[in-house]
Design a protein with these regions (language model features):
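A short linear hydrophobic-aromatic micro-motif
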Residues: 31-37, 71-72
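C-terminal structural segments of small proteins and small subunits
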Residues: 50-78
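Short, charge-patterned binding micro-sites
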Residues: 39-47
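Short glycine-/aliphatic-rich beta-strand segments at the starts of folded cytosolic domains
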Residues: 2-11
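Short amphipathic alpha-helix segments
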Residues: 14-33
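Small/polar loops that bind or transfer phosphate-bearing groups
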Residues: 10-13, 51
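A generic "binding-loop/recognition-motif" signal
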Residues: 15, 37, 55
């Protein structure tokens, strides 16, 4: 079985928010990728953004500057 590692998981209330974050991050070279929401988290839509926990500050600042919305940001072992 694969060893679980800490990951920053960003959840969204709506799928359109997740898609906007994915588009913005890819266009601006920000780290992470879209994943299905882990079972340990509840979210409005079934998609989440996964990145390294060390990227939390940079992603939060970028999302705020771009006016992107998210529901929750947590660090989980996944």
């Amino acid at each position: 079985m694969r060893e679980k590692k800490d990951a920053l998981v960003v959840t969204f209330a709506e799928t359109t928010q997740a898609m906007a974050v994915e588009t913005y991050c890819h266009a601006n070279g920000l780290p992470g990728r879209i994943i299905p929401v882990p079972r340990a988290v509840t979210a409005g839509c079934g998609l989440a953004w996964k990145a390294a926990p060390a990227d939390e500050t940079a992603l939060t600042a970028a999302f705020l500057m771009a006016g992107l919305d998210w529901e929750n940001m947590v660090v989980l072992k996944i």
